[in-house]
Amino acid sequence: GLAAAMNVVDLPVHAKPRIAILSTGNELVAPGGTPGQSQIIGSNGPALAAFITDNGGEAIDLGIAPDDPKTLGSMAEKAKGCDFFVTTGGVSVGDHDIIQEVLKQAGLEVNFWGVAMRPGKPLLFGHIGPMPFLGFPGNPVSTMVCAVIFLKPAMAVLCGTDKVANPV
């Protein structure tokens, strides 16, 4: 009604970006589950899903994957067809930090790995074919700081804006 009252016939519209989320780590248990010894509830996936939805995207939560190359590779396949792929955990330099290695086998081209900030230093960015990829650290605070600083502006571009505000 408002557009018609202003005699505006054409309005730009953009589809919501579909963003796949994969949480990784043998230590993670899905919310509602019972953590065993040395396990924690995986909160990054639900937090990112809410963040993505609040910022105009459609969250595709792929759940939790263990630190297993075969499983991680098959989960990466499920992200294909999305507009963006985000993982949490597995991007630092520990023995179980295998995201970069596994996703390179799935076609990941790394644009950069590591940023000069804390929290969030081991952030990974690249592309799997035309799909952008962000690998966030597993720490929940690091994940959400990286989402605000890196994912939110990327989502704005995917939503068609030509003006991306500095998130900080």
Stretch-by-stretch model annotation:
Residues 10-15, 53-54, 77-79, 116-117, ...:
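Solvent-exposed alpha-helices and their adjacent loops that cap or buttress functional pockets
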